[in-house]
Amino acid sequence: MEIRAEEISEIIRKQIKEYGKEVEVAETGTIISVGDGIARIHGLDKAMAGELLEFPGGVSGMVLNLEEDNVGAAILGEDNENIKEGTTVKRTGRIVEVPVGEALIGRVVNAIGQPIDGKGPINTSTFGKVEVKAPGIVKRKSVHQPMQTGLKAIDAMVPVGRGQRELIIGDRQTGKTAVAIDTIINQKGGDLICIYVAIGQKRSTVAQVVSKLQEHGAMDYTIIVSASASEPAPLQFIAPYTGVTMGEYFRDNGKHALIIYDDLSKQAVAYRQLSLLLRRPPGREAYPGDVFYLHSRLLERAAKLSDDCGAGSLTALPIIETQAGDVSAYIPTNVISITDGQIYLESDLFYSGVRPAINVGLSVSRVGGSAQVKAMKQVAGTLRLNLAQYREMAAFAQFGSDLDKATQMQLARGERLVEILKQPQYRPIPNEKQVLIIFAANNGYVDDYPVASLRRYESELYSFFDGRKADILAELRDKKAIDDDLKGKIVAALDEFKKEFTA
């Protein structure tokens, strides 16, 4: 084969013409030490707090500590063999962002918004910053719309409003997650988008939650963010912020969202681990000094926005696990003081068969009263007081046998009220039916029946109204209040049902 000089020179000329000189300028640093999800990096002098860093192997990181001669960063992903001492880390100049938008609904994502459900990539071009300031005072409006949980005990006595932060607190195995999942299932057919953030949970538990939600058709309006127990502490720390960023997208677009953090005790533990590894000084129970701010800045992002800002809302139900019922520990007291009330679940009640195991005396909703449906407020006004008096009397009645008639009647009524408020899991009840059963219990319609037959009384009452008195249910649903005319109809219908029901 003959080599022709003019051809070679032509090719070289062409290549020189097409040669484009691109210089990429990036600020880089070198890893000094790495381990337990924390890297110390030298040379990133201009890095910002909370900035996204690029580690080798496509792993991201987040700047947490800015020190004189190095930067402490959390690695948002599994430590891999590419991340070691001496490797190069790049600045991005961006704060950590996660995907947001409608495309996430029905998906299961990890702590940085990447899909983990095997359904392919998430098609969204919208991203939200993980750390943003909560809405100011002017942008907010007081809570005034109800957020129905479908649980009689909560909707009647500890009502939750849209934009509220209501803590669910209790020991392990008292049904905290069950309350949250029932609330999600109850939103079916409504306008609420739900986000469930699982922090430090077993993967099998998260899979169980997903399958239950699919079974009840609730994944059609739910996003699940999972940072399981086997994932590094930085991911467990950032997962709640990822979830709230996704919820804020709906809130800021005039929609309504509900976010559940299950649970924030595990996030605090992950943050404690990060802080100690970053050599921040420990405080009470070895938590860092800013652990209060960790939760307050997260929960303050749940809000009811004013009409000028689109009137959207983000409701938060954080969960905290107590140890042996100790509500006065550090993290529980912090979160109680941040939230607008708490639902306290008690293991003694749970094991005695009262489920949901809500302790009415210690549970409170500080702002939900103004959001409660008027009809429920009318029938449940005395319920809380009656139950509290019953509990007190029942405690005294253990010591004395000679009780007068009035006390015996009050104890019998209280026993029936407790029974009426019990509810099986995954069976939320619409508000109008809750109003009916509580109205019946308060007005003595169940006093003559044995406690054991009340579960059957309740289900047959619902069937009776569904089949023959659907107009009353519709009127309750539309009016949301009981006037004299409607009260007369309900009383007549309950009298009619009483003749038919046999215990």
UniProtKB/Swiss-Prot annotation:
Enzyme category, top tier: translocase
Pfam families, A to Z: ATP-synt_ab, ATP-synt_ab_C, ATP-synt_ab_N
Chain sites annotated for binding ATP: 170-177
Organism encoding this protein: Geobacter metallireducens (strain ATCC 53774 / DSM 7210 / GS-15)
Membrane-related topology note: Peripheral membrane protein
Keyword terms, alphabetized: ATP synthesis, ATP-binding, Cell inner membrane, Cell membrane, CF(1), Hydrogen ion transport, Ion transport, Membrane, Nucleotide-binding, Translocase, Transport
Gene Ontology, cellular component aspect: plasma membrane; proton-transporting ATP synthase complex
Record protein name field: ATP synthase subunit alpha
Database matches in SUPFAM superfamilies: C-terminal domain of alpha and beta subunits of F1 ATP synthase (SSF47917), N-terminal domain of alpha and beta subunits of F1 ATP synthase (SSF50615), P-loop containing nucleoside triphosphate hydrolases (SSF52540)
